[in-house]
Amino acid sequence: AEMRNFALRDAQGNEIGVFTGKSPRQAALKAANRGYTEIKLRERGTKKVHIFSGERVQVDKPAGAPAWMPDKIWKPKVKKEGIEKLD
């Protein structure tokens, strides 16, 4: 599977960043982990905008995690809200 590029759009429709991933969800998780909560990702080369709501929750690091990891880590969660089509 090819990596796909998803452009992050702000409320004004400006593309403010690019996240890569095999799926829109994977890209949305990366955006959520940077603190974005309303995530609109336009797939490069298409007119489709995938809309997610995102949040980060702080959790204990998993058992068996490497020692250099902090005890608390941020875990992104996203929920797909729908798809918009651009004209």
From Swiss-Prot:
One of its GO terms (molecular function) is DNA binding. One of its GO terms (biological process) is DNA protection. Gene3D superfamilies: Chromosomal protein MC1. It holds the Pfam family MC1. InterPro entries: MC1, MC1_sf. The keyword DNA-binding applies. Keywords: DNA-binding. It comes from the Archaea. The keyword Oxidoreductase does not apply. Protects DNA against thermal denaturation and modulates transcription. This is Chromosomal protein MC1b.
